[in-house]
Amino acid sequence: SSTIISVMLGVDYKIAVILVSVVVTIYAVMGGLWSVTLTDFVQVFLIVFGMMIAIPFALKTVGGWDNVVATLPKEKFYMVNSSINPKTIISLIVMYLASFTVGQEAVSRYYAARDDKAAVQGSLLAGLINIIYAFIPTVLGLITLALVTNGTIPKDIIMKDGPKYALPLLAMHTMPSVVIGLLFAGII
């Protein structure tokens, strides 16, 4: 959220962090778990569909998927590099299962479910959405890298501020204002 605010309004990142923290805290305290749940639902919808809509605009700007493939080195398209082995994959799975399923943000939603069946259904749906969602930012990241490589997106901004600015910069350079607004509304 702070990154989006920083890019859109041109304010310092630290000021954006403070601003977002104050707004989110007030909203969550005044509305409780119900307001947070509603916000989660709207955010998931806007982020997933906003990013899906973003792909065609970004591909049009870069000149199509063939240009992405032609611009980037082959190794950028490998899902697993040589440093990842079965032990690493198992360790990551154990770490994610042990941390995300017992985190406060997840547990509070389990206990807020109407009944056990709703908790299981919600967890399964969230897992399915996360599996689908895992690939969308990857595609957008590859397109952004191609646009930085060919000079459409200035490399100095990414080098100065880091990769956290990749999605906002991609959006600002490739998408109409309405799509940017929907996407950023979901992220914020």
What are these regions (language model features)?
Residues 1-16, 112, 169, 173:
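Helix-loop-helix connectors at the membrane interface of multi-pass transporters/channels
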Residues 33-34, 143, 188:
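Gly/Ser/Thr-rich beta-alpha loop segments that engage phosphate groups in nucleotides
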Residues 35-42:
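Interfacial helix-loop-helix linkers and transmembrane-helix boundary segments
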